[in-house]
């Protein structure tokens, strides 16, 4: 090739590169201009979330389209912009936007510190304690009709009950899941609820077991898994009884710890608050009751270990997506996951070649029966899902110039009709009274029957005790260590870790008091020097009572801790293991408190 031709080719490449650069630059400028135009308009609200699962964005898009059409009919041009952000980048994105003062109007709550709620979000109690106006408007429309269909009459009967209620009381859980005790406030309004179930391959069950019914007991879960494992080995095929990752293992741990140890949670709940807190957990350790050698705790760990023997090798390094991929490929008999994955799983299975597709069954994790030869003596019954609560919640940031419009959007989204519509498309479970889930989602409906609570080695949420327990738990479950090694390593390191966590709890209670007192004073001033109408005054009185409760708790927390330690010392166990633990703990605590 001649030199001139080479130079000509180089020039063309340079021109192409320059053209690409110009296009990208122009696109970036257009995006900035477009965003600035939107920000300058009073009728644009931006909504950010991390839900990238199949159907969720479509459900929100349909909701947005209907809301924009409604506002257009009312003579107002409104644009709602949906901004999905990958889960892994969500915290960084939201934090940057909030701190920089450029946050969207509404943000899905979660993945960021709770302190951000009080600093960057509007409290919503006053709005939530009043009726949702869309319900009253729809009821008035139906009442004006001289003739109503059967569906409309059913809807009218429902709305007669819901329309006068406070907005928060139209949620199945009363929106309790969105109450933030640290601020005694509500900051979020949710659209869905979620539960965890087991999915299974009916075709594979029929081939291996001769039937396609789910296991009815824990014993059958084990025997079915054994049969699938043996079938794979006999036919020299890669077949997993239970597709799993670290994520799924944690689900099993939570479920069966609850089923086997929830009675200990109630027993060690010294102040009868309804659950054992971190301080009470520590007191049980100092009494020699809460140890890795406690027979109930060990039984729960044995249950999880027995299930882990059916997980794939190296499951610790796998992600939730990896285990899901194995299941939809037909390479696993079962998988446990939440209702949020249901639509994605079903769609991916249907995308397989016809010969690889299979029918999916869904069942709840089977409970330990009272007749189980090893664990029946400890079986307390199934774990309740009463605390499933309302999720997929959005808060309104203090940076919005459209607060009322944001509230209106959330109210519109949480009518029975629209809540049904959004969740039908998303494949999730609705949360509003009267909203109807899809037929195949009824297996995911929260089951409130059962017990709550379990015992864990945790003194401070996310503290050093929990971190240490996690460090030794995973080698145990993956088969790298035996139980005695797990127990010894955990117990020997707990005194120092527990002392650090206890100090943080002890000092944290004192540091929180000033804010509580300020909040109490504000509510008290509103009540005493009010001049408000009766409804607002009643709201302020409720808030005053709520603010007093945590204040009294924080005022008495240190005295409670001191007295608990005194009682524990008076009734200290005398076995060598407990004596050594207590001595090490109090030495470490003395060091911590002196710093």
PLM region spans:
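Conserved N-terminal structural module of periplasmic/extracytoplasmic solute-binding proteins
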Residues: 1-122, 126-152, 497-595
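A bilobed periplasmic-binding-protein/Venus flytrap-type ligand-binding module shared by bacterial periplasmic
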Residues: 199-202, 391-403, 421, 476
């Amino acid at each position: 090739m001649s030199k001139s031709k080479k130079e000509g080719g180089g020039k063309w490449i340079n021109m192409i590169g320059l053209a690409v650069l110009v296009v990208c630059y122009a696109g970036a400028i257009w995006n900035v201009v477009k965003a600035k135009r939107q920000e300058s308009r009073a009728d644009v609200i931006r909504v950010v979330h991390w839900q990238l699962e199949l159907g969720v964005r479509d459900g929100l898009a349909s909701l947005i389209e209907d809301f924009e059409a409604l506002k257009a009919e009312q003579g107002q041009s409104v644009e709602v912009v949906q901004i999905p952000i990958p889960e892994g980048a969500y915290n960084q994105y939201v934090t940057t936007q909030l701190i920089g003062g450029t946050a969207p109007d509404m943000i899905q709550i979660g993945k960021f510190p709770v302190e951000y709620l009080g600093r960057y979000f509007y409290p919503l109690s006053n709005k939530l304690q009043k009726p949702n106006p869309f319900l009253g408007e729809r009821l008035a429309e139906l009442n004006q009709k001289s003739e109503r269909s059967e569906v409309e009459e059913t809807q009218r009967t429902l709305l007669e009950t819901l329309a006068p209620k406070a907005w928060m009381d139209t949620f199945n859980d009363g929106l309790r899941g969105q109450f933030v005790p640290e601020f005694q406030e509500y900051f979020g309004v949710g659209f869905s609820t979620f539960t965890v179930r087991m999915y299974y391959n009916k075709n594979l069950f029929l081939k291996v077991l001769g039937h396609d019914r789910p296991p009815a007991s824990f014993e059958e879960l084990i025997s079915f898994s054994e049969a699938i494992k043996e079938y794979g080995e006999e036919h020299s095929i890669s077949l997993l009884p239970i597709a799993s990752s670290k994520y799924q293992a944690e689900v099993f741990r939570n479920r069966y710890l609850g089923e086997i140890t929830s009675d200990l949670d109630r027993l060690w709940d010294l102040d009868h608050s309804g659950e054992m807190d971190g301080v009470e957990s520590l007191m049980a350790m100092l009494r020699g009751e809460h140890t890795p050698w406690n027979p109930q705790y060990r039984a729960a760990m044995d249950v999880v270990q027995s299930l882990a023997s059916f997980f794939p090798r190296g499951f610790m390094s796998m992600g939730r997506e990896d285990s899901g991929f194995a299941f939809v490929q037909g390479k696993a008999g079962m998988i446990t996951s939440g209702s949020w994955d249901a639509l994605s799983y079903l769609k991916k299975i249907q995308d397989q070649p016809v010969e690889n597709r299979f029918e999916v069954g869904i069942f709840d994790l089977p409970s330990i029966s009272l007749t189980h030869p090893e664990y029946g003596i400890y079986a307390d019954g199934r774990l309740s899902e009463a605390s499933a609560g309302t999720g997929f919640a959005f808060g309104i940031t203090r940076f919005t110039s459209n607060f009322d419009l944001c509230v209106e959007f959330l109210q519109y989204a949480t009518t029975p009709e629209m809540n049904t519509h959004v969740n039908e498309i998303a494949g999730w479970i609705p949360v509003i009274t009267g909203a109807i889930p899809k037929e195949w989602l009824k297996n995911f409906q929260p089951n409130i029957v059962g017990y709550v609570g379990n015992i864990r080695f945790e003194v401070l949420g996310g503290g050093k005790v929990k971190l240490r327990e996690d460090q030794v738990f995973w080698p145990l479950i993956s088969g790298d260590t035996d139980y005695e090694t797990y127990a010894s390593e955990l117990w020997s390191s707990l005194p120092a870790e527990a002392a650090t966590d206890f100090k943080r709890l002890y000092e944290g209670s004192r540091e929180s008091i000033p804010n509580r007192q300020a909040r109490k004073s504000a509510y008290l001033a509103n009540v005493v020097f009010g001049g408000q109408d009766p409804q607002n005054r009643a709201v302020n009185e409720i808030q005053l009572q709520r603010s007093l409760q945590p204040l009294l708790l924080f005022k008495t927390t240190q005295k409670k801790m001191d007295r608990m330690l005194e009682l524990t010392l008076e009734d200290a166990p005398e076995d060598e293991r407990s004596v050594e633990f207590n001595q090490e703990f109090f030495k470490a605590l003395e060091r911590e408190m002196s710093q």
